[in-house]
Regions:
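Mature N-terminal, pre-catalytic/accessory segment of carbohydrate-active enzymes
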Residues: 164-165, 172-241
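A surface-exposed beta-strand-loop module
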Residues: 147-169
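Catalytic core of carbohydrate-active enzymes
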Residues: 1-134, 140, 165
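Weak global preference for isoleucine
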Residues: 18, 34, 43-44, 50, ...
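Sequence-structural signature of mature extracellular/luminal beta-sheet repeat domains
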Residues: 142-144, 235
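Short, surface-exposed loop motifs enriched in S/T, G, D/E and P with embedded aromatic residues
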Residues: 96, 144-149
């Protein structure tokens, strides 16, 4: 798929690949995948409770994906899901703010009609595209217990029993940076699944080790090899992202 990436840093939502923007690129995926990109600083609330019955109320568990690299603010809007009361501004709004310079993410108290949201809620905040391996959690300014773990390349922090009036602050280490792509691992995984001879796989693997991250050399060598356009393109995507 040919895409245009505006200026900035972009993250693939599903596989975690990190791209620098300001250019067009060809992105390669399997038949079961599509590229979905989030910009640095993106704040994306989600829930797994999507059945017909679930959507009649607001969820007591929310996952919030937060991407590293830039400041951003998001306001989560919720209403009663059934009536037209929202036309009279009968709603609940939860501000969420990422202060990347301070390495801090905040979920502020619910504004508006707090009765529209659960009396307590569990937030699972997933930090994507960051080098952080740990975090501290504060509820109303007091350090709180939270489950912190790495999950599928994300740093996941679960904060339970959050009341509508609570302020949740998650602080990452000061030295947290935007993560870097593991080019070798991604390229070797691609080769593992490529339908080519083992000799060709070995040649490409040796080239990757020999070039030691030198993009221009890798690109030139790949162009000179007798590879399919798709395989060459997929390798170049990983190398030049």
């Amino acid at each position: 798929t040919k895409v245009w990436l505006p200026e900035g840093t972009w993250f693939d939502f599903f596989n975690g690949m990190i791209y620098e923007g300001g250019r067009s690129m060809d992105l390669y995926r399997t038949l079961e995948e599509i590229p979905v990109l989030a910009k640095a600083g993106a704040i994306i609330p989600m829930t797994e409770k999507i059945s017909a019955l679930d959507v009649e109320s607001n969820p007591d568990e929310l996952t919030v994906r937060v991407y590293a690299g830039a400041d951003n603010t998001f306001i989560l809007y919720e209403d009663d899901n059934t009536s037209m009361a929202y036309e009279k501004n009968d709603c609940a709004k939860t501000p969420m703010t990422l202060e990347w310079g301070a390495r801090k993410f905040t979920i502020a108290p619910v504004e508006g009609n707090q009765s529209l949201v659960p009396e307590s809620r569990t937030y699972c905040v997933e930090f994507g595209g960051s080098s952080a391996k740990e975090a501290k959690v504060f509820v109303n300014g007091v350090e709180a217990d939270a489950e912190v773990k790495e999950k599928d390349g994300l740093l996941a922090i679960a904060v339970a029993d959050v009341k509508p009036q609570d302020t949740v602050t998650i602080c990452l280490p000061e030295d947290t940076e935007i993560a870097k792509n593991d080019v070798m691992t991604r390229a070797m995984d691609l080769l593992l699944h490529a339908e080519i001879s083992y000799i060709t796989k070995e040649q490409i693997a040796n080239l990757l080790h020999k070039a030691d991250g030198k993009v221009a050399i890798l690109a030139a060598e790949l162009q000179s090899m007798e590879l399919s356009n798709d395989l060459r393109g997929a390798l170049l995507e990983i190398i030049t992202a």
